[in-house]
């Protein structure tokens, strides 16, 4: 398995399995001289960790992070930063019924056909449990971006199943377990999830992520375009089946006279492009949306096959999120931050001294 590293100059390599002794990552390329403590990282991990409400998996993991290297006397040294998170609440017996069968919608079948072996306990390496190290690495990236460039990366849930969540204010996001930017709709979301859980079923979600303060110039055309790398990173999150940058698929129905964001001396008029033109950041907010499929692990009996190719009926009895999208917001934020810090360093390496006579215009003319 050779696809475990994200990034070019700021790289993150994750390791571990859902029911192994520990999970973690190695961050390479972090600039030296930034203050960093375990508390800085823990604050982000606590936003993602399981067991925080009745609407998510009841697996109780503290997700306490340990910094093993790369930090001396509270400051990054420029050497690899190793983060370790120990697994403490594995319950592998819940997966005894799928040792010889494949769960529909999961990576069981494809991992088996590719590698000839699979860790059936909670999905092993393919588990969303492995997003915890991504959030840990994302905390490092967020801190550097904020302190060096004033970049803020924020996310929220914009839809749960067929329920749209209208945006009200960012302050609402941290006040509810759904990361909803609208406190008034939370009771409806809770009732929806309670009914879903009783049915033994699951549902998908849409998450919006915004990076503000990104300067013009980040991105490496043509194959490492900023939006291309964002899309790749987002699609690397478990259960993500779609990514939009800016207007996304709505662009299909928009005329060029509407979609093309005009430029004025006072700034851009609109941001249909999502803060990226030609694969390079414009200086506007970078806006991303992801579509997350329904959780495949449900209690409803479903048809499948055994390793021998025979018909089978599969029921999943482990502790699972009825909607993985509920905890996806900090994961999506982290992925965006990791792409941005990588491109910030790449831009600095080649074009950090480039200056033009054209003034940098505001992200919005209003």
Swiss-Prot record:
GO terms for cellular component: cytosol. Reduced FMN (FMNH(2)). Keywords: Amino-acid biosynthesis, Aromatic amino acid biosynthesis, FAD, Flavoprotein, FMN, Lyase, NADP. It catalyses: 5-O-(1-carboxyvinyl)-3-phosphoshikimate = chorismate + phosphate. GO terms for molecular function: chorismate synthase activity; FMN binding. Homotetramer. Belongs to the chorismate synthase family. This is Chorismate synthase. It comes from Burkholderia vietnamiensis (strain G4 / LMG 22486) (Burkholderia cepacia (strain R1808)).
């Amino acid at each position: 398995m050779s696809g475990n590293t994200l990034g070019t100059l700021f790289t993150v390599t994750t390791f571990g399995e859902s029911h192994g002794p520990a999970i973690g990552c190695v961050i390479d390329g972090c600039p030296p001289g930034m203050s960093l403590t375990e508390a800085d990282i823990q604050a982000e991990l606590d936003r993602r960790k399981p067991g925080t409400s009745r609407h998510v998996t009841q697996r109780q993991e503290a997700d306490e992070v340990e910094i093993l290297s790369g930090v001396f006397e509270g400051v990054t040294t420029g050497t690899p930063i190793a983060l370790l998170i120990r697994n403490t609440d594995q319950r592998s017996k819940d997966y005894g019924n799928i040792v010889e069968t494949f769960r529909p919608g999961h990576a069981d079948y494809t991992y088996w056909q590719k590698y000839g072996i699979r860790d059936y306990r909670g999905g092993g390496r393919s588990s969303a449990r492995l997003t915890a190290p991504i959030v840990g690495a994302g905390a490092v990236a967020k801190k550097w971006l904020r302190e060096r460039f004033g970049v803020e990366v924020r996310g929220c849930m914009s839809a749960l199943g067929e329920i749209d969540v209208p945006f009200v204010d960012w302050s609402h996001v941290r006040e509810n377990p759904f990361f909803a930017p609208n406190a008034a709709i939370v009771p409806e979301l809770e009732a929806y999830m309670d009914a879903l859980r009783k049915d033994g079923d699951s549902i998908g979600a849409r998450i919006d992520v915004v990076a503000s303060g990104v300067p013009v110039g980040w991105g490496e055309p043509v194959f490492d375009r900023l939006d291309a790398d964002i899309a790749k990173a987002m699609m690397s999150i478990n259960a993500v089946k779609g990514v939009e940058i800016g207007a996304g698929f709505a662009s299909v129905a928009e005329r060029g006279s509407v979609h093309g964001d005009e430029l004025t001396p006072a700034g851009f008029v609109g941001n249909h492009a999502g803060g990226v033109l030609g694969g390079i950041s414009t200086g506007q907010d970078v806006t991303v949306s992801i579509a997350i499929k329904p959780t495949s692990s449900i209690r409803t009996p479903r048809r499948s096959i055994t390793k021998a190719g025979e018909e089978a009926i599969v029921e999943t009895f482990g502790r699972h999120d009825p909607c993985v999208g509920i905890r996806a917001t900090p994961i999506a934020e982290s992925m965006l931050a990791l792409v941005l810090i990588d491109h910030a360093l790449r831009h600095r390496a080649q074009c950090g001294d480039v200056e033009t006579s054209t003034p940098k215009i505001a992200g919005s003319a209003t």
